[in-house]
Structures are given as C-alpha cells and as structure tokens.
A protein has these predicted regions:
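A glycine/serine/threonine-rich, flexible loop-to-helix segment
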Residues: 181, 193-219
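Alpha-helical segment proximal to the catalytic Tyr-Lys
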Residues: 132, 151, 177-178, 243
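Active-site helix of classical SDR
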Residues: 127, 164, 172
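Substrate-binding pocket helix/loop in short-chain dehydrogenase/reductase
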Residues: 100-104, 108-113, 215
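Residue(s) in the substrate-gating loop at a strand-loop-helix junction
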Residues: 147
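Canonical Rossmann dinucleotide-binding motif of NAD(H)/NADP(H)-dependent dehydrogenases/reductases
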Residues: 3-35
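Short, small/polar-rich loop/turn modules that mediate ligand/substrate recognition or access, typified
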Residues: 180, 185, 190, 245-247
Length: 256
C-alpha cells in the first residue's frame, strides 16, 4: 500500500542533513507541505536545492533554534496559517553538541545543559507548540527521533546524551497518554549507529578499523543503517497506516 501525505502540513526539525533531510524529502515526495527547519543555513539551503532536483518543491526552509520558544511559536504559526493546523511534527534536532565522551567528574554543568536543551527541551517546545493545532483538528502525528542510547548504553560515552535520549522516550510515553483522547499519536524511532552527520562521522573514524569491525559484527544484518532506513520507519508511523500505534519506540538498528 502506498503512503500518501497529500494535503498534509508537516514540520521537521534538524532537517539540514542526514536523517532529517531524508525525512523531509520522504514527506515532500509523498505530497506533504514541509516546513524544514535547522540552525545550519548553508546546509539547509543545499538540502532544498537537492529536493528541487527531484521535484520536492513543497519544502519551506526556515532557520529555527528549537530551544527558543518564541522561534518555535513563530514557526508553528506560519506553518499552520494556511490550513489552520499542523498535521505532522518530526523532531530530529538534537545530537551531542560537539562533545565527546569523558569521565563524569570532568563534565561541566554547561555541557550537560547544552545536550539536554537541544534534545529534550527542543522536542518538548515543538510538541507544546503544535499540540493546540492538532487538538483543534482532532488528529495529528508527533514523532521524536531518539536513539538506541536512550534504551541502553550510548556508544558515545556521553552521559548527558544517553540521559536526554531516555528522557525523550519518557516524554513520548507521557504525551501519548495525554494527547491520545484528541486523536494524536506520539511515537519515537530509536536509530542504531547511522553515519548521517559530521558528529557520527567523527565517531566512526575514532573507532578505528578494529572498532568498526566489532560494531558491524554486533549487527545481525551486518551493515550500518542509512538515513533512508530511519525515514522509512518514520513514514509509516506518521501515516494513516499507524493510527492505532502510540506511545511506542521503534528500534531501527539492524537487529542489534
């Protein structure tokens, strides 16, 4: 069965590259009008140009810091101006904020805060922003990209990252319970290791050949996932095929 988002309005955060880019193009190519936001202006513009080459002309790029409530509110107001509501929210913005793993006694409060701000606060503010429009329309889809780190031990070794990703999963469960009576589903996808952005690429290189080999051996499918693998899972969960699925976290990790 084909998945269509004709007539739907979607917001994707962290849309400039990797998983966010794949999700943006996946939604747009299936008929959605997508408001793609990020703080990386050059990468965001490149993503839109790439979409134009494949007829994904319904992508509207916006520079938005998801930790800034005023900017999130303005984005939701603009995106919902036409139809009166936002149908789909996909929160991809997050990551390790340029950090690397270190002993807990060396972690600063600011480092801890930076990761929680973009991962957990950002997802909270975006969900908070779209909830009224979804309630008014009687339906909606909220999807948060978490991580396998939120379900187990982070390969990054970054305490705040593992904690923030676990926090996202807790937020998903709570919002699913709260928003379900309004016809709104809330789910998350927990990717395995994906070489989808500069941070994950640095991590891959730092593993060295032996570390890379061990990682691959622990994946039953014996390959790394691609951004499109994550996007495909998202397409299903935000579609009409998943109207009875909420509060769930889908691991997309090759069986690891």
């Amino acid at each position: 069965m084909d998945i269509s988002f004709d007539g739907k309005t979607a917001i994707v955060t962290g849309a400039a590259h990797g998983i966010g880019e794949a999700i943006t193009h996946g939604l747009a190519s299936r008929g959605a009008t997508v408001w793609a936001c990020d703080i990386l202006e050059d990468a965001l513009n490149r993503m839109v140009v790439a979409g134009s080459a494949t007829d994904d002309t319904s992508i509207h790029p916006r520079i938005v810091d998801v930790t800034n409530k005023a900017q999130v509110t303005a984005l939701v107001e603009e995106a919902s101006a036409g139809s009166g509501h936002v149908d789909i929210l996909v929160c991809v913005a997050g990551g390790v904020s340029g950090q690397a793993g270190q002993a807990i006694e060396n972690v600063t409060e600011q480092q801890w805060k930076d990761i929680f701000e973009v991962n957990l606060k950002g997802a909270f503010l975006c969900a908070q922003g779209v909830a009224p429009t979804m309630k008014a329309s009687g339906e909606g889809r909220i999807l948060i990209i978490s991580s396998g780190a939120g379900l187990g031990v982070s390969l990054t070794g970054i305490q705040a990252y593992a904690s923030a990703k676990a926090g996202q999963i807790g937020l998903v469960r709570q919002l699913a319970h709260e928003l379900g009576p309004y016809g709104i589903t809330v789910n998350s996808v927990a990717p395995g290791f994906i070489r989808s952005n500069p941070s994950s690429e640095k991590q891959w290189i730092a593993m060295g050949e032996e570390g890379q080999r061990r990682l691959m051996e622990n994946i039953p499918l014996r390959r790394l996932g691609a951004s499109e693998d994550i996007a495909n899972a998202v397409m299903f969960l935000v579609s009409d095929l998943a109207t009875y699925i909420t509060g769930q976290t889908l691991s997309v990790n090759g069986g690891r």
